[in-house]
Amino acid sequence: MKRTFSVIVLFLLYCALCAFGYAASHPSAPAGKRTVAEILREIGPRAESRLKPYFDKAGVSYPPSRVTFIGLKDELELEVWAEKGRRWVYVATYDVYGASGGLGPKQKAGDGQVPEGIYNVTELNPNSRFHLSMKLDYPNGFDRLMAQSDGRSHLGGDIYLHGKTKSKGCIAVGDRAIEELFVLTARTGIKNVKVVIVPYDFRSHIFHSAIRITPSWLPDLYEKLGQELANYGQRDHI
């Protein structure tokens, strides 16, 4: 009887050790995975304590109905505008710490260029290695159409607004700023957020001599972007 009991104990111990070894070598899920909801609970309160004074000063309710981020490549700035009634109101400006390449649009994978155009946010990434990030829908319809007319392929992708201070082909605004932009986008709804990226502020300059990438369709793109920026006025006069 004692021998049978000992065999059973040894068998159960063996099974437990096997199970432990399997679990150790086959983790069920990577550690540290967070959801957008968790970010809003953990980071939301402190980010919104910094955000709301901007909206109070601008006279816009928070969260707003729609938001536009304007990325100014030459100025290394990201403006935030919110819809109030039928007009757009300036809210805040963030510094851009990292944006590789020069003035001019992105045309292919690996060129290091930050895209230029009007984009939507398609994804909020709470597990980015750049703290937090927001994915843009580059290449958009215009990008694809111009690539087709040029006979180009391999346009690249995975363009983000993200934290940290360095980037290649994306826009890095630092951890503090991306927390605010991430929370603002989540509260507003990604379908209500637009991102306009321009080589320089068309509201202040007519043409910038530093532009070296000049495909035949560039004037059409810049005319379109200029018309878009005209909806937001000049922030210095607000």
Q: Where in this protein do the model-derived segments appear?
A:
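Positively charged n-region of N-terminal signal peptides that target proteins for export
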Residues: 1-4
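Bacterial N-terminal signal peptides
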Residues: 8-18
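Boundary at the C-terminal end of the N-terminal hydrophobic targeting segment
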Residues: 19-25
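Extracellular/luminal recognition modules and glycoprotein regions
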Residues: 26-62
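N-terminal post-signal-peptidase region of extra-cytosolic proteins
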Residues: 50-68, 80-81, 96-110, 114-121, ...
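Primarily extracytoplasmic ectodomains and periplasmic/lumenal surface modules that are beta-strand-rich
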Residues: 75-79, 85-89
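Exported/periplasmic cell-wall-interacting domains
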Residues: 110-238
